[in-house]
Structure formats: structure tokens, C-alpha cells
A protein has these predicted regions:
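Conduit-forming functional cores of very large proteins
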Residues: 1-187
Length: 187
């Protein structure tokens, strides 16, 4: 049934593991990577043909079921803090930002949206309190290995004003709210 397939695909997209061995060379919209994946302790016979038993996925967590301090804790999980601090279940979230240059005809006027150096004098409408300093002067893209937060512009883009031909209006792309990290690739 169709709704069940959609639900199943949605659940699979949320799975955290090493979904592909060339994830560093791929550009996916979003991906979750388990940093310290392990090969499973219990394996199926089919696994040795598919992955040669070298493809890590999941974590081998040791679980003990018992009463804690005399009370029955049925709906709780107690995890060792030292294990978490050493990296148990640590994941990396990759997110892609994309933009396009466009040429549009609006009435008799041609409107161009282009990647550019936003810090030029003829660009108006800059976003207040946003950091444009990490953008490349030639391409308008953020430089690789740059730390980004919610106030960082990742793609410098501007639209030519219809009224004044030499004036551009800022249309830059920023990170989503709450996302912090480092730029992996920019092209």
C-alpha cells in the first residue's frame, strides 16, 4: 500500500548510519552520519555478500535490564556519561544550500539575479547583523572550512534593481535557524 511505503521511506531517511561509502564525494540535500559506526556483533548470512562485513552501521551498545535503586524504572534508559563524552552515538549532520542565477523579463525590464561580491558600494538592502566577511570576492560563495552560525551568509547573491541599473538589492542565502558548523565544500 502506498501510504505505508511513504511512511517506511520517511523512517529510513531518519536512520543514522553510514548510508554510503562515498558520502564525502556526494552532494545530498541532507544526511546524517554516525561518527563512530561499528560492524554488528550479530550478523546475517547475507551480510558477508553485501558489505564484506566491513561496512559499519549502528553502535554496539551494551544494555543491562535491572531495577535501579529498588524502583521499577520501566520507561527510562540510563546511559553512562563517560561513554557519551567519549563519542557514543555522536553524529554529524550535513545540509546543502543551493542558489541559482536567473534572468527574468518583468514587463519591459530585464531582472538579473547573480552571484557577486555583496560588500560593494552599489548593493543595498544588506541584512543587518549578518556576517558577509567570509564570502569569496569573485564567486560570492562562502570559503571552505569556515565556521558558520545562524547569522552567517553562505551564498552572496544580488538582484539588479529595475529602477536604477547600477544598483543591486541583496538576495543572499543564509543558514537555517539553529544550524552551526563548518563549511565542507563550496562550488
Amino acid at each position: 500500500p502506498y501510504p505505508r511505503n511513504v511512511f517506511s521511506c520517511g523512517q529510513a531517511k531518519q536512520g543514522v548510519s553510514l548510508f554510503h561509502t562515498n558520502f564525502t564525494n556526494r552532494i545530498d540535500k541532507t544526511s546524517y552520519i554516525l561518527n563512530y559506526g561499528q560492524t554488528p556483533l550479530v550478523k546475517s548470512r547475507y551480510l558477508k555478500y553485501v558489505t564484506k562485513e566491513k561496512h559499519p552501521y549502528g553502535e554496539n551498545a551494551i544494555v543491562a535490564i535491572m531495577c535501579y535503586s529498588g524502583y521499577n524504572v520501566e520507561d527510562a534508559v540510563i546511559i553512562n556519561r563517560a561513554s557519551l563524552e567519549r563519542g557514543l552515538f555522536r553524529t554529524t549532520y550535513f545540509n546543502m544550500y543551493e542558489a541559482h542565477e536567473e534572468k527574468q523579463n518583468i514587463g519591459n525590464a530585464k531582472v538579473d539575479t547573480v552571484f557577486m561580491d555583496i560588500m560593494r558600494n552599489n548593493v543595498i538592502g544588506l541584512k543587518p547583523d549578518y556576517d558577509y566577511s567570509h564570502l569569496d570576492k569573485k564567486t560570492g560563495l562562502i570559503k571552505e572550512n569556515t565556521y558558520v552560525n545562524t547569522k552567517t551568509v553562505v551564498i552572496g547573491k544580488a538582484t539588479r534593481s529595475i529602477i536604477e541599473k547600477d544598483v543591486y538589492i541583496d538576495a543572499s542565502k543564509t543558514t537555517k535557524k539553529g544550524q552551526i558548523g563548518y563549511v565542507d565544500k563550496a562550488f
